[in-house]
Amino acid sequence: MSGLRALLGLGLLVAGSRLSRVRVQAGSCRAGATWWVPQRLISGGRGDSEVMASSAVKYLSQEEAQAVDQELFNEYQFSVDQLMELAGLSCATAIAKAYPPTSLSRSPPTVLVICGPGNNGGDGLVCARHLKLFGYQPTIYYPKRPNKPLFTALVTQCQKMDIPFLGEMPPEPMLIDELYELVVDAIFGFSFTGEVREPFRSILSVLNGLTVPIASIDIPSGWDVEKGSSGGIQPDLLISLTAPKKSATQFTGRYHYLGGRFVPPALEKKYQLNLPPYPDTECVYRLQ
């Protein structure tokens, strides 16, 4: 194991149990208005619960999420990199609200960002860059890099900000628990279908054994977009982008934020998204 540490250039391990970190983090996030009420928690009675259910933000199917994305690109002429920048900033902001640097035991707090090969991975790269600006020390693991100018540019931006990239994934959950205070899951998004293949199958297996919190971007990797978890990772923070997906009703973590404040009002009305009122200039809204 000492050879692996030397290879990764990660330095000495910091002692301390995960339990103490959880106690520090509990209640550290500013309390916000709660907009989201999972349908599975609503009783059959009438009254306030029914009003909250009728006013709740809409949960999108995979087909609906793809349709909204296509309209943003085609009808409204947003570019991929434009939405990726806004989404990644939202993710970093939600993380900073849920886990402020002062609530964590290290200075700067160490964060491992694991990026997949698609747009979700691009969101993770942008998120890592903003986390560095917010006072965290991110490290990126990006095993499958698409040969496209957009992603090459995002990698360069992170490198220019002295954000390290790992050559290999730490193989044991305990090692990640000792080296990092948070893991960002930016592996798969809502467009993913089919079986999880290597190296991501092994990565998810390691993540399943972590005790440090996981923050998932849009969809917890390994989850069905509509049905939710089938024994996959259980994030502590979920950042839904544009609008929550149906799988979010199965989320049981402590923090659920909505990010991506870029939906035109006409598009929101067309799909009846019923998005919550973002306060002032905030780019995220706490749903749970």
UniProtKB/Swiss-Prot annotation:
Its EC number is 5.1.99.6. K(+) binds at N120, D185, S221. It comes from Bos taurus. Undergoes physiological phosphorylation during sperm capacitation, downstream to PKA activation. Residues 65-275 form the YjeF N-terminal domain. Homodimer. Interacts with APOA1 and APOA2. PANTHER family: NAD(P)H-HYDRATE EPIMERASE (PTHR13232:SF11). Belongs to the NnrE/AIBP family. It is an enzyme of class 5 (isomerase). InterPro entries: YjeF_N_dom (IPR004443), YjeF_N_dom_sf (IPR036652), YJEFN_prot_NAXE-like (IPR032976). Keywords: Isomerase, Lipid transport, Metal-binding, Mitochondrion, NAD, NADP, Nucleotide-binding, Phosphoprotein, Potassium, Secreted, Transit peptide, Transport. GO terms for cellular component: extracellular region; mitochondrion. Its cofactor is K(+). The lineage of its organism: Eukaryota, Metazoa, Chordata, Craniata, Vertebrata. The modification N6-succinyllysine is found at K144. (6S)-NADPHX binds at N119, N120, G121, G122, D123, G189, F190, S191, F192, T193, G194, E195, D218. This is NAD(P)H-hydrate epimerase. The keyword NADP applies. SUPFAM superfamilies: YjeF N-terminal domain-like (SSF64153). The gene is NAXE. Residues 1-32 form a transit peptide. The modification Phosphoserine is found at S49.
